[in-house]
Amino acid sequence: MGPRVLQPPLLLLLLALLLAALPCGAEEASPLRPAQVTLSPPPAVTNGSQPGAPHNSTHTRPPGASGSALTRSFYVILGFCGLTALYFLIRAFRLKKPQRRRYGLLANTEDPTEMASLDSDEETVFESRNLR
């Protein structure tokens, strides 16, 4: 048997995960500039509990960043869903019912009208007469 080929959805999922992980790794490991190529002594290793430590955290994100990308995207999607629901609610309540069109005798059943036949040779025509 030949090499196993990944299914397209699984392949797309792996590609999306790699692309999502790529910016995280790019922030942490910046390329060296030509001035940094010179050898320098390694920085002193300090304990995170010492007073000079910037923060006591196990997260690798910079101190200015808040939350993970997944949390932020969840809030963005939640906001879009909320705006969509608000749009449809406003549209439903502002929707005015169309006024009934009145077609004379068909819509006006309360008027006392009488239909009388007019005799003619070709066809029978009815005349509407109001009996008020």
Curated annotation (Swiss-Prot):
<protein>
    <recommendedName>
        <fullName>Protein FAM174C</fullName>
    </recommendedName>
</protein>
<keyword id="KW-0472">Membrane</keyword>
<keyword id="KW-0325">Glycoprotein</keyword>
<keyword id="KW-1133">Transmembrane helix</keyword>
<dbReference type="GO" id="GO:0005576">
    <property type="term" value="C:extracellular region"/>
</dbReference>
<feature type="modified residue" description="Phosphothreonine">
    <location>
        <position position="113"/>
    </location>
</feature>
<dbReference type="GO" id="GO:0016020">
    <property type="term" value="C:membrane"/>
</dbReference>
<feature type="modified residue" description="Phosphoserine">
    <location>
        <position position="117"/>
    </location>
</feature>
<keyword id="KW-0732">Signal</keyword>
<dbReference type="GO" id="GO:0005737">
    <property type="term" value="C:cytoplasm"/>
</dbReference>
<feature type="transmembrane region" description="Helical">
    <location>
        <begin position="73"/>
        <end position="93"/>
    </location>
</feature>
<comment type="similarity">
    <text>Belongs to the FAM174 family.</text>
</comment>
<dbReference type="Pfam" id="PF06679">
    <property type="entry name" value="DUF1180"/>
</dbReference>
<feature type="region of interest" description="Disordered">
    <location>
        <begin position="34"/>
        <end position="66"/>
    </location>
</feature>
<feature type="region of interest" description="Disordered">
    <location>
        <begin position="113"/>
        <end position="132"/>
    </location>
</feature>
<feature type="signal peptide">
    <location>
        <begin position="1"/>
        <end position="26"/>
    </location>
</feature>
<feature type="modified residue" description="Phosphoserine">
    <location>
        <position position="120"/>
    </location>
</feature>
<feature type="compositionally biased region" description="Polar residues">
    <location>
        <begin position="46"/>
        <end position="60"/>
    </location>
</feature>
<dbReference type="InterPro" id="IPR009565">
    <property type="entry name" value="FAM174-like"/>
</dbReference>
<feature type="glycosylation site" description="N-linked (GlcNAc...) asparagine">
    <location>
        <position position="47"/>
    </location>
</feature>
<keyword id="KW-0597">Phosphoprotein</keyword>
<keyword id="KW-0812">Transmembrane</keyword>
